A protein has these predicted regions:
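Short amphipathic alpha-helical coupling elements at transmembrane boundaries
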Residues: 82-85, 113-123, 159-162, 166, ...
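Helix-loop-helix module between adjacent transmembrane segments
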Residues: 7, 97-106, 123-124, 135-149, ...
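C-terminal ends of transmembrane helices
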Residues: 48-55, 103-117, 121, 364-374, ...
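Alpha-helical transmembrane segments of multi-pass membrane proteins
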Residues: 127-139, 166-215, 241-248, 418-431, ...
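Membrane-core helix-loop-helix motifs of multi-pass transport proteins
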Residues: 168-178, 182-275, 292-295, 491-525
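Hydrophobic transmembrane alpha-helices of multi-pass small-molecule transporters
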Residues: 1-94, 235-238, 245-407, 422, ...
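Hydrophobic or amphipathic alpha-helical targeting/insertion segments
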Residues: 73-76, 86-169, 203, 207, ...
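Re-entrant/interfacial helical elements at transmembrane boundaries that shape
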Residues: 68, 147-162, 205-209, 218-235, ...
């Protein structure tokens, strides 16, 4: 154990040394034409952080904390106060509120009840049962982190599978053939089915992971890449996508891709050859019956969550309500430069989605549902990663580095058809995400994709501003559609780590789905870009 740990430390130090050497070489090299000295140092910082993120040499949040240090040490920023501004970005507080709301849902098992209810009511056939698991997972993943959702749903799925296959037949990696189970049960059609793994098991568990990733696309707080993009658009372009606006981006993607992945898993790749799932449906109902009815505190959490989600959506409907509300109330509720009911001019709006989210935290405490030590038990590392990414995005924009990268690397690609541009962005993002986390990929690529606005504006027939939004949104969506390797997304890692899926199952299935989803996302994004987003987002 000591030798192995020593070897790991040595490997980490070697990787870190190589990254530092590359960073120094960029910093001391002659400044490229069209790039300022500050831009060169920012480029070196981007190389340093990006390399550490991709290689996993250091934990992602630790690398994020190094960004403001390097930016200040090299003189890109005069002081740490300026370099640390990204760590106080409003979206960090939105995600913090989302994490805390999710903690409250989990404390009272509200998320588990929703999942079990869906499975008990929908799971009348093998395919419908898998669909119920995927629908529950995707729906919860819009509001609870996809990591927490998958961690909760995986044991539920295994428990339900044990009733379908008999508990001895839920194969784990390394198991021999279950006693009394013919090996033929594992070869009931489909592709890549190992002897001990039935199609039902593979389809349900992979469906759980993939549904969590897809569902996260639906809302800003559903998955970190969404918030990373929104934060960097605000940092670089000063453009803000609200909670309701993101629903117009994410929900169509979820509504199209989730049923398609379910169909491919259950009809094409792993069609279940089991007729009767009554016991599984009964098991889901039994799990649900074991849950006591929600106590008053749990009901108050449900009310607060529902009210928060409703106000998030309502906050994006100001344009539609302007004809029915006095100007003073429009400014107070939805923001603007006019007079408010408080007698002051200019207001962000009480229904601003970050304000609504943050106010849910004291509401949980006042309702006597959560203690502070329960609220703060959240993923602070992800919040630090957001801060580092926004700090880097600010520096890339302030020094003109994103525009320089876009013009230098991608200028020869102008004139490509729109569909080919989208396909290239989606394919590159999916490929990179398979090698590193989707959060790290988005943090690295979002500033570059935003910078491509100046390169492809004429090709797309849009302004540079709109082109930057379009390309970067496409990339952020694609970051949630890497299905082949455990490292790509937290849901993939959790399902693989459960021991009930082999990496070969995920790899073969994921490669096929990656190819299909690249084509589907390309067409879907083009349709949204052509007929929806221009009328609703800009």
């Amino acid at each position: 154990m000591i030798h192995r740990n020593l070897s790991e430390v040595q490997t980490r130090l070697v990787k870190f040394g190589i990254v530092c050497l590359g960073t120094v070489l960029i910093a001391v090299a002659p400044t490229p034409e069209g790039l300022s000295l500050a831009g060169k140092y920012t480029l070196a910082t981007m190389f340093f952080a990006g390399s550490l993120w991709v290689t996993g040499t250091l934990p992602l949040p630790v690398t994020a904390l190094s960004i403001p240090v390097l930016l200040t040490a090299t003189g890109v920023y005069d002081d740490m106060d300026t370099a640390l501004v990204g760590f106080a970005d409003h979206l960090i507080f939105l995600f913090m509120a989302g994490f805390m709301l999710a903690n409250a849902l989990q404390k009272y098992d509200i998320d588990r009840r929703i999942a079990l209810y869906t499975m008990a009511k929908m799971g009348s056939s093998p395919r419908r049962l898998i669909g119920a698991v995927m629908l529950s997972t995707a729906g919860l993943s819009m509001w609870v982190s996809n990591t927490a959702t998958t961690a909760m749903m995986t044991p539920i799925a295994v428990g339900v599978l044990s009733q379908v296959l008999s508990s001895e037949s839920v194969a784990a990696v390394g198991d021999s053939a279950p006693e009394g189970t013919a090996s033929g049960t594992a070869t009931d059609g489909g592709i890549g089915t190992a002897d001990d793994f039935t199609n039902m098991q593979i389809g349900m568990l992979l469906g759980t992971a993939y549904a969590a990733s897809i569902g996260g696309v639906g809302t800003i707080i559903g998955t970190p890449p969404n918030a990373v993009l929104v934060g960097q658009l605000n940092a670089i372009l000063g453009y803000e996508i609200g909670f309701a606006e993101w629903l117009l981006i994410g929900l169509p993607v979820v509504f199209v891709t989730l049923p398609l992945v379910w169909y491919l898993l259950t009809y094409v790749l792993y069609p279940p050859q089991i007729d009767n799932v009554d016991e599984a449906q009964e098991q889901a109902q039994a799990y649900l019956d074991e849950e006591d009815s929600l106590d008053p505190r749990g009901r108050r959490v449900a009310i607060i969550f529902t009210a928060t989600a409703g106000l998030w959506v309502l906050g994006g409907l100001g344009t539609f309500l302007s004809a029915y509300l006095p100007d003073v109330w429009m400014t107070t509720l939805f923001g603007g430069s006019g007079m408010t009911i408080f007698g002051l001019e200019g207001h962000q709006g009480i229904l601003y989605y970050v304000m609504v989210g943050v106010m849910a935290i004291p509401a949980l405490v006042l309702a006597d549902t959560m203690e502070w030590d329960e609220l703060v038990d959240i993923d602070w590392g992800t919040l630090l990663l957001f801060g580092g990414g926004i700090a880097l995005a600010d520096a890339l924009a302030d020094t003109g580095t994103t525009e320089w990268i876009a013009n230098t690397v991608f200028s020869d690609l102008t004139g490509m058809p729109v569909v080919l541009i989208i396909a290239t962005v989606v394919l590159v993002v999916v490929f990179l995400t398979e090698m590193t986390s989707n959060t790290a990929t988005t943090t690295i690529l979002a500033p570059i994709l935003i910078g491509l606005g100046s390169v492809f504006a004429a090709t797309l027939g849009l302004t540079e501003f709109k082109t930057a939004i379009f390309l970067s949104v496409s990339g952020a969506i694609a970051a949630s559609f890497a299905f082949a390797l455990p490292v790509a997304t937290p849901p993939n890692a959790i399902v693989y780590g459960s021991g009930y899926i082999k990496q070969s199952h995920m790899l073969r299935t994921g490669v096929i789905l990656n190819i299909v989803m690249t084509a589907v996302l390309t067409g879907l994004i083009w349709l949204l870009f052509t007929f929806v987003w221009p009328h609703l987002l800009w």
